[in-house]
């Protein structure tokens, strides 16, 4: 669907006409409501993207409903900071580190398994021509930034999904805009 896009053809008419959800949006909402209300178990949720702050509500809800929560993308580095790891020049939200730590604790208390990357593709700069290097999550150099999950993490995440009866996925695991990290 396109409801999330801020393009003139999507948002323009709604400013001048009565607006309602279309059939596709209604179907998506019904599907998600069903998934979260009574998921077939095991329920594995995968959340990626760049910022914890933009997904905080989703993450909180998933800790209450998922059996396993897989975290990737730029938001993983904020969780690494909450665990006391160094993240080099990686994207991070310093203001959300404490909240990320609280979410890790909440998941542990509820018996929800949290999977974070165990290795990462890093680079010396953010750009299309950046050359990936693979490093362990606890060994990100100070002059490198995380751009994607690494090959061991890909295997770990694939294994976690294999036995799932329900999988919910929202957001990318890396900088998909650059071919070397897509």
Regions found by a protein language model. Give the residues of each.
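Active-site loop-to-helix "anion-binding N-cap" substructures in soluble metabolic enzymes
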Residues: 1-182
């Amino acid at each position: 669907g396109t409801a999330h896009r801020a393009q003139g053809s999507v948002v323009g008419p709604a400013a001048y006409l009565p607006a309602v959800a279309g059939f596709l949006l209604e179907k998506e909402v019904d599907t998600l409501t069903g998934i979260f209300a009574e998921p077939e178990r095991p329920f594995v949720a995968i959340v990626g993207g760049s910022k914890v702050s933009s997904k905080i509500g989703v993450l909180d809800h998933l800790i209450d409903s998922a059996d396993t929560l897989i975290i990737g993308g730029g938001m993983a580095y904020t969780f690494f900071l909450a665990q006391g790891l160094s993240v080099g020049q990686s994207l991070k939200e310093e203001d959300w580190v404490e909240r990320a730590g609280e979410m890790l604790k909440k998941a542990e208390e509820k018996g929800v398994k949290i999977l974070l990357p165990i290795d990462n593709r890093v680079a010396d700069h953010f750009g299309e021509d950046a050359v990936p290097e693979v490093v362990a999550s606890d060994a990100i150099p100070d002059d490198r930034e995380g751009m994607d999950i690494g090959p061991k993490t890909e295997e770990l995440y694939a294994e976690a999904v294999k036995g799932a009866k329900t999988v919910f996925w929202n957001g990318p695991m890396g900088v998909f805009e650059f071919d070397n990290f897509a």
